[in-house]
Design a protein with these regions (language model features):
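Active-site-proximal polar cores
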Residues: 1-25
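Short, conserved turn/kink motifs that form compact alpha/beta structural patches or helix kinks used as
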Residues: 4, 24-107
Length: 107
């Protein structure tokens, strides 16, 4: 992987909890950082969810390794060109340790 292959901007978001006006806990998302990324789509699948077909679009996201990038967990998500990807695994370093790869799934 070369730095020039990172051609898409990805905003990584972590889950946050806050309280609404009624005091109820509300789940939301907070932007943590934005980085250049490469998306490599894997073979898509379909699954039956609640008696209807649901398509799945798994992909490998690659970003440059940094302290912020190493903080990403499988609870986070990435927003790329308005499309939301749930991070399915903690990032793992590439053999040269310059980049991190993670499995994500478009929702």
């Amino acid at each position: 992987m070369n730095a020039g292959d990172l051609s898409t901007r990805a905003t990584f978001q972590s889950p946050v909890q806050s309280r609404d006006d009624d005091g109820q806990v509300v789940q939301g998302w907070a932007d943590e950082f934005t980085a250049w990324a490469n998306i490599r789509y894997l073979r898509g699948t379909e699954a039956v969810m609640q008696a209807r077909m649901q398509s799945r679009s798994p992909a490998i996201l690659t970003i440059r390794s940094s302290a912020q990038a190493r903080a990403v967990t499988s609870e986070w998500r990435a927003v790329i060109d308005g499309r939301v990807f749930e991070v399915r695994e903690d990032p793992r370093p590439t053999p040269d340790r310059a980049f991190l790869e993670m499995l994500a799934e478009a929702i």
